[in-house]
Design a protein with these regions (language model features):
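Generic recognition of short, well-ordered alpha-helical segments
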Residues: 27-28, 63, 121, 151
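Conserved catalytic-core motifs of eukaryotic protein kinase domains, centered on the activation segment
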Residues: 61-62, 134
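Conserved CoA-thioester-binding segment of acyl-CoA-metabolizing enzymes
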Residues: 1-59, 69-74
Length: 179
């Protein structure tokens, strides 16, 4: 499965599970994540969540360039129920990008490698971020002539110094966990 959702006592763990693809987001993965997040919010036994990526190379590299991005841009039609949910259910994109979806429990990001584009946008919606020394962060969309879709233009500048946020957003350059 592209998402592993486990519960242990009061802790929910969400693991993006596509390590060979740097945990890139596909329609199926974002739908499963949205559904798991809804379960997390609604389960009174759960008190904290941990969001991570499988493997040690990437937390999440963002949207899958072959499936997710062509679907959202309209370059390919919906071919299955996962695709249709992404396009027709606003909840799916709101919850999976951790924006416009209220979570009243702490959500911790355990960042174990590259955290790019949509992956970084998800992290902006978490409460605590713990990054491995080798983690890198970037919003490289500007290099493709597009902007981040999940609110990073606003959320990033509210969470880090404005000048640093502008540099990241306007250059697409990566920063390391150490920086």
């Amino acid at each position: 499965l592209p998402l592993l959702y486990t519960k242990s006592g009061a802790i929910a763990t969400f693991t993006l599970n596509r390590p060979a693809a740097r945990n890139a987001l596909t329609p199926e993965l974002v739908c499963r994540l949205a559904d798991a997040l809804r379960d997390f919010v609604e389960d009174p036994a759960l008190r904290v969540g941990i969001l991570t990526g499988a493997g040690d190379k990437a937390f999440c590299s963002g949207g899958d360039l072959g499936t997710m991005l062509p679907l959202i841009s309209g370059d390919r039609p919906a071919t299955d129920d996962w695709d249709r949910r992404v396009l027709e259910e606003p909840f799916v994109m709101a919850a999976s990008s951790l924006r416009d979806f209220p979570i009243d429990k702490p959500l911790i990001a355990a960042i174990n490698g590259a955290c790019m584009a949509g992956g970084m946008e998800m992290v902006l919606g978490t409460d605590i971020r713990i990054a491995a020394d080798h983690a890198v962060f970037a919003l490289p969309e500007v290099r493709r002539g597009v902007i981040p879709f999940a609110g990073s233009l606003v959320r990033l500048a509210r969470q880090i110094p404005h000048a640093v946020a502008m540099e990241l957003l306007l250059t697409g350059e990566a920063v390391t966990a150490v920086q």
